[in-house]
């Protein structure tokens, strides 16, 4: 039994991987731009603008998109079970990263405290960059989710079920074997107690 999805071909998966790499590189470049932008601020009366996304380095998480995209491209050419499982795990990680990064960006854009007038322009530009990055997160989420769903077309589910059944049988056999050992040990203890009682009675 296999989950087949003929609409997603190897060429389409390669395109998805390339788009992931491009998104990841763009995020890393934007992180470098924001780093230079915020480091160039001047400490005034109202301080500098340092949002939570800058402190957490969420744009730098684009490296995960680059790595996932590279594995996706390679998995499209070499469709081995281990490669597909590894790539699917990375894409699931990217889904989690996009959700967290988008949440932090929304928190940043929903609050804006007063900053020094000298840093207002930099803060405004940084928030615009965050808005652009926020628009790219749904695209990365959709790509990672699409690959995670379509990758089941290359995974033999019957072998996975068989391996799970085999592991379950081994665990149950081990538990039964331990129970038999405990019962045998209990019987031996009872035998020793009865022999001891007989010896004491004869004495």
Swiss-Prot record:
Localization per Swiss-Prot or TrEMBL: Membrane
Any one Gene Ontology cellular component term annotated for this protein: membrane
Functional summary from the UniProt entry: May be involved in signal transduction as a component of a multimeric receptor complex.
Main location: membrane
Protein name from the UniProt record: Membrane-spanning 4-domains subfamily A member 13
Gene (UniProt): Ms4a13
Similarity remark: Belongs to the MS4A family.
Membrane topology: Multi-pass membrane protein
Species whose genome carries this gene: Mus musculus
Record keywords: Membrane, Receptor, Transmembrane, Transmembrane helix
Matches recorded under InterPro entries: CD20-like, MS4A
Membrane-spanning residues: 15-35, 56-76, 84-104, 141-161
